[in-house]
Amino acid sequence: MTYYVIGEPEYETSNWYRSILDGLIAEKRQRRLSVVMLENVSALQSLLPEQEDVIFIIGTNSKWLDGIIELCEARFFNRCIVLGNHNRRLCGRSYSIVTADIARDVRVLYGYLESLGCRRIALYGVNPESTSDAFKQESFLSCGGQEADIFRNNGSLAGCFDTLQQKRTEYGGIICVNDYCAISLVRHLPESDSIPIVSCCGTPLSGYFRPTITGMRIDYEAFGKAGLDLSRILQKNSNVNAVNIFLASSFCPGETTDGLPLPNRTVAAEPVTVKSADRFYSDPEIEEMLRVEALLSSCEPEDLELLHRLLAGETYAQIGEALFMSTNGIKYKLKGLCRQSGTRSRRELVGLLQKYLIF
């Protein structure tokens, strides 16, 4: 069994890629695995993998991933695993992911800035080509951020800053998509500007930069171990199309928020009532189908035979003779079936089942 690895060319220049690969190589040595690096797409296209072989795809660029995953799926079927902060959006494709829990990270940072009194929060440095940043953007909007509060990096952090600077006074806090954007922002802002800045994704460079950056930190070397553990599930279960693993990050306060820690989590003193806004389930037709489905799903073979004979118009005596039950036993069972289906009589139950051509 062989584990193949292919990396996004641009992403290979990043420390994130190197850390993920280092973790994978460390696991290779410890577990004595066969790991083969694919230098380019041509090497992938000429590959004839064995039945249990797995491919790891390291990258985050949406266009690159689109093409690579299509090629990998044709060769490895469900044994394709993306390692990297990635937002799964290629519906219908059989591939799995190991990623940071981006939605949680953004939610933590957004709530943290709100706890500091930041009334309007910006998301800064979003790369339109990154599936990771697309996920951060979605999470930011779900937290209450607005589209107008998102500042995109179209290949120029200086240009991104110029756009923010025009609206700077409107914001009380800024979430940067990664430490590179956070460092750039701090360097461009005047020293007198003390706006709280946090980052979704750490880098080694920020460990040397001053002021230190508040943000979420994750061990990228853990991606490899998680990917190998995930591969075993896929190898043993051909009916499993995809598995997503979300790795936990840790919050690290820094000087960009005066070292203030996360606020203590509070438990509500009173029970909170959460009302569903999904009107799908309040549709009387859906409610009725759900009742029929629940009834049939809970039936034993004997119950189904009873219902079948009821629909055929047989008398209690005929049904009892066929099922070796007394008339009272049949009536008792029928009473339970009516209760389960929300009907009040044999006629109502038969009418309900006939609606859906049951049996």
Feature map (PLM): residue ranges:
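An alpha-beta-alpha
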Residues: 107-147, 243-259
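Recognition helix of helix-turn-helix DNA-binding domains
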Residues: 313-348
